[in-house]
Amino acid sequence: MKSCHLKLAEAAFFIELFEATQERTESLTRGSDLETEASYLFSAIMNSFYSALDQWRDPATNKKGYEAFVKQNPEIYSHSHFGGWRSTTVHVGHIPITHAGYIPPKGGEVSLVFSAPPKLASTEIVEGRADLTFSPYYYVAYRGELKEVVSFARAHLHKLTVLIEFNEQSLP
């Protein structure tokens, strides 16, 4: 397995841990609160994305694809003075969770997420019953806009995985 694929798996791992902090409604460690732990995991997710993309990059074969992807995703990959999260958390300072709670989707949209619950947050499954669980969502700010972390991170992980796998298939 190529190193960039391990970094994609690492990002998925941190996203699941992040989601577990939301669903458990209690911190994972003794030394932190939920929002602090979520912000640590957010930084880890951003670093995993950056590492996967950087390890995939090859100036001889995919320079244009790399540059286009970075340009399309400035909230992660731009320099810190432009608000890039990864660069800010590594070179400037900590990125706190901006909001914990629920912000409805814009324009009457409905956001349904169907996925397996994080293993750390799993509860006993009762056959024939569906439980709706409401817990806070964590948001981070980018240029005045709040982005829900888990949805954003899952969508970005998918885009990054598609980029890497598509380009590997098209190589001779």
What is each PLM-predicted segment?
Residues 36, 40-55:
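Core of folded catalytic or high-affinity ligand/protein-binding domains
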